[in-house]
């Protein structure tokens, strides 16, 4: 039993004694991203998807650690330079620091990113109350529409709208401003990854409520 693990039912690990908040996510080529043909965009998607776990808890991420595996093609000099450039951009944008990691060989590209921040409090999943209002940030479904376009399951001509949805797939907006206020007014929170209904159900079940 480790109380900091929050019963493995939350987005993060929270060491209340030391004010440490940690989240870890793994992304597999063909499962969590289509391919590694645009490594500069894929790494941005991975960074933002990972640090959003901390933002949704009301915590500002400070450090990230990246473990990656791939083949010679995915780890080519050209791709590594693109990844390096994107990581620098993301570090400046979100004021985070790449602080370690590891690389190894594999057939498919796989990336594990661990995010770390500090906070005396977090917004947990299991604190919902009856009659709580429900809020979301951003436009739900933009990233999914971008995925459908890339998979050629949704056809849009080369318009600003098409470019917009693809951009949201690779570079989702993070609620950095509202995140700092969550601890003051939110009883519960979750980083949406399985759709609004699916993740709302998780919040309700974790809080032993029903609908």
Where are these predicted regions, by residue range?
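Helix-biased detector of long, well-ordered alpha-helical tracts
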Residues: 1-211
């Amino acid at each position: 039993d480790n109380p900091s693990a929050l019963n493995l039912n939350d987005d993060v690990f929270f060491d209340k004694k030391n004010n440490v908040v940690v989240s870890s996510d793994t992304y597999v080529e063909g499962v969590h991203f289509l391919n590694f043909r645009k490594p500069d965009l894929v790494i941005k998607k991975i960074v933002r998807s990972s640090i959003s776990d901390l933002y949704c808890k009301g915590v500002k991420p400070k450090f990230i650690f990246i473990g990656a595996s791939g083949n010679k093609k995915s780890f080519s000099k050209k791709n590594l330079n693109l990844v390096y450039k994107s990581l620098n951009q993301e570090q400046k944008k979100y004021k985070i620091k790449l602080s370690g990691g590891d690389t190894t060989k594999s057939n498919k590209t796989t990336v594990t990113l661990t995010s770390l921040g500090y906070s005396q409090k977090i917004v947990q999943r299991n604190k919902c109350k009856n009659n709580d209002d429900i809020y979301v940030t951003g436009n739900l479904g933009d990233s999914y529409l971008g995925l459908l376009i890339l998979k050629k399951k949704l056809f849009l001509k080369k318009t600003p709208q098409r470019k917009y949805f693809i951009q949201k797939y690779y570079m989702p907006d993070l609620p950095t401003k509202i995140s700092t206020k969550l601890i003051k007014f939110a009883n519960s929170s979750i980083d949406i990854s399985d759709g609004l209904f699916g993740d709302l159900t998780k919040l309700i079940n974790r809080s032993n409520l029903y609908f």
